[in-house]
């Protein structure tokens, strides 16, 4: 490989998703010379551009975890960023629902612990005021939640980063990382680049990049596809904002929810189906070596045993539209199968440990002159600027 530029950078960031871009902006604020290497033709083509577009409140996550702290801080920073850069968003809150009142009450107690103002338990009549077409009897209203298009957020970030002298190199799939004389050299199939420090924000491939850097991560990224449907526009009046079920405490996925997007469409989803490729956006996208790697991983074998029924249920819902509709009807009864139109799916990069745990919190691992983001599923988009702040404070010291 030829050395692409004799220019030396302070930092190389692998991955032009929203976490990589946020980190780049924070390092740039400290006057650092930053290069982003992205394997695609533009930024935010994977997780950052294929998600529910929710600005999360932080209410779901264990207090004082990375997810909780960085989501709450990140939401503040994100709102500031959206306002400063005229990126459209809506902040009209969401309703969290559960059959079991105890779950709603414990979530309410957590909101009080986190000093979230305006969160309240709604009974049937108040719920019908907010969502007259739902069939929910009880729920929690969380005013801090909103919606935004994270792909346009990422594109805005990329514009600012480059206007301020930052560089992004596209079509750079990383094949090697070496180190000599305190320098990191990162090689793609066609070029190599040098910097003082490396930051891995490679999302679905973050564990592989960590291995190239000589780390032995105790987790593997397992890809879970999340499929979405859009409700036909004639039925757009059926939802005002967002309705979410309370997550299964054992699974880090939030379950099928209904969201009114920034541009006024209603989306239903996502489910969570094991994907047969790291970028397996459809059933037909199959990568043999990646699939063998997934199913032979001892953590996956243990996980599979534990969640075989859940996994089969999710697959059934993916292959059987009426099963998906049934889930949606638990929230809003008037939506029929013919009202649902397929949307592009997303794939979540979910870290799974060797003992079969789905890692619930964000995970960062330090290497020699490197830092690796090894688990950044939802709410990482909401938290992105706070993750960037956290990473830059670690690497600048």
What name fits each language-model region?
Residues 53-126, 136, 255-256, 265-267, ...:
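Dinucleotide-binding Rossmann-like beta1-alpha1 core, especially the glycine-rich loop
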Residues 61, 88-98, 124-164, 183-189, ...:
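Helix-loop-beta segment of a Rossmann-like dinucleotide-binding subdomain
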């Amino acid at each position: 490989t030829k050395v692409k530029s004799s220019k030396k950078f302070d930092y190389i960031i692998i991955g032009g998703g929203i976490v990589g871009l946020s980190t780049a902006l924070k390092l740039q604020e400290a006057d650092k010379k930053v290069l982003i290497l992205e394997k695609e033709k533009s930024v935010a083509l994977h997780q950052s551009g294929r998600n529910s577009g929710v600005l999360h409140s932080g209410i779901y996550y264990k207090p004082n975890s990375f997810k909780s702290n960085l989501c709450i801080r990140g939401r503040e920073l994100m709102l500031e960023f959206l306002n400063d850069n005229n990126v459209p968003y809506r902040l009209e809150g969401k309703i969290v629902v559960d059959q079991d009142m105890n779950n709603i009450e414990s979530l309410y107690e957590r909101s009080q612990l986190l000093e979230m103002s305006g969160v309240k338990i709604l009974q049937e009549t108040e719920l019908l005021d907010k969502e007259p077409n739902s069939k929910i009897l009880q729920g929690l209203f969380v005013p801090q939640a909103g919606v935004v298009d994270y792909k346009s957020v990422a594109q805005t970030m990329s514009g600012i980063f480059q206007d301020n002298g930052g560089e992004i190199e596209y079509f750079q799939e990383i094949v090697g990382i070496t180190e000599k004389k305190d320098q990191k050299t990162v090689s793609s199939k066609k070029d190599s680049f040098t910097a003082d420090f490396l930051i891995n924000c490679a999302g679905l491939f973050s564990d592989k990049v960590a291995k190239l850097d000589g780390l032995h991560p105790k987790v593997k990224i397992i890809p879970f596809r999340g499929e979405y449907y859009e409700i036909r526009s004639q039925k757009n009046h059926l939802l005002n904002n967002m309705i979410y079920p309370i997550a299964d405490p054992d699974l880090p996925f939030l379950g099928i929810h209904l969201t009114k997007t920034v541009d006024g469409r209603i989306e239903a989803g996502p489910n969570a189906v094991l994907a047969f490729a790291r970028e397996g956006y459809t059933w037909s996208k199959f990568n043999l070596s990646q699939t063998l790697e997934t199913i032979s991983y001892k953590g996956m074998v243990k996980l599979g045993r534990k969640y075989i029924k859940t996994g089969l249920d999710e697959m059934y819902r993916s292959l059987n539209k009426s099963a998906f509709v049934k889930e949606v009807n638990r929230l809003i009864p008037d939506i029929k199968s013919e009202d649902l139109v397929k949307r592009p799916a997303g794939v979540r990069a979910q870290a799974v440990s060797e003992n079969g745990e789905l890692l619930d919190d964000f995970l960062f691992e330090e290497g020699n002159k490197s830092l690796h983001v090894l688990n950044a599923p939802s709410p990482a988009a909401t938290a992105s600027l706070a993750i960037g702040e956290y990473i830059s404070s670690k690497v600048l010291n």
